Amino acid sequence: MNNPIPSNLKSEAKKAAKILREFTEITSRNGPDKIIPAHVIAKAKGLAVLSVIKAGFLVTARGGSGIVLARLPDGKWSAPSAIGIAGLGGGFEIGIEVSDLVIILNYDRAVEAFAKGGNLTLGGNFTVAVGPLGRNLEGNVSLRSSAAVFTYCKSRGLFAGISLEGSCLIERKETNRKFYCQDIRAYDILFGDVPQPAQAEDLYEILNSFTEKYETEGQRINLKKVAREQRKAKELPPKPSSRPQPSRPPVQLNAGSQSNRNEYKLYPELSSYHEKTGSLSQPIEVTALYSFEGQQPGDLNFQAGDRIIVISKTDSNFDWWEGKLRGQTGIFPANYVTMN
């Protein structure tokens, strides 16, 4: 485990880079399903990396040190700000344990709360959840979660659950002053008033690698999606080439005339169409084998698996039939459905 005793910012940045590698690289102890997904860090608005010591005898006390960084508007990472963590917990625990923590700040407001106030209490106004694991995890998992903060904890080299509710991230002002050679607040550091320090080069190298991995994964997912759509398009049966056409152009309807209102409809009740179709005294039901997205007014949209009531049909399955679904009436390719 890494040293939880507070040290200078250069050492804290070096420790943070080491911890991030341990949390994100596949090893004999960390399989592909036991690493922080690249997209979680690539999409983070901020992150904190710390080493924590927990001691307990009836009541547990937690303390440690690390750094916090924020995502700048241009997508780059800010300079690091030194932080500490402190908290108390209940439960009958006896002993001492050292853990490494990675805390992901998913929303700007979580970063701002720390930057403006100089500390951030986990829980309360900010929901805390154990972060997702797994290299192949879909990138939208973090988007589906409403948690403002993700936490990852490793104890003795293994991921472990840890409750950080009520723990507080605290700004270490004196450590920042010594490193940056000026009185400077976390707010100014995290919002880009100082450049990335050369002493933290290793840290930025690994942080930038997550963005590259995420973009590579995104390209791979997009390529798979395109290939899947192309295969699906090839598998779809061709639509009938000819559509039922109106025998005359639409007439101007008189709002007060019910007979005029029924005189013209886009597809149903056209004499030229019904000469070759059969109106069904007992409507039959068909099930969609494929999804169909209409391309012209009067087409009936449906998804694979939908049940459609057939209003009128021809003897050919390679033709346009008329049906009704969810209160909508329109025509559809008959070879996209099967009889129930």
Swiss-Prot record:
One of the GO BP terms on file: regulation of ruffle assembly
Species for this entry: Rattus norvegicus
Listed Pro residues bias regions: 238-249
PROSITE patterns the record matches: SH3 (PS50002)
Biased composition (Basic and acidic residues): 226-237
Domain of life: Eukaryota
GO cellular component: ruffle membrane
InterPro entries, per database record: SH3-like_dom_sf, SH3_domain, SH3_domain_YSC84-like, SH3YL1_SH3, SYLF_SH3YL1-like, Ysc84_actin-binding
Designated name of the protein: SH3 domain-containing YSC84-like protein 1
Region (Disordered): 224-259
UniProt family annotation: Belongs to the SH3YL1 family.
Gene3D superfamilies per record: SH3 Domains
Keyword annotations from UniProtKB, A to Z: SH3 domain
Complex and partners: Interacts with SH3D19.
The gene coding this protein: Sh3yl1
Residue intervals of the SH3 domain: 281-340
Any one GO molecular function term: phosphatidylinositol binding
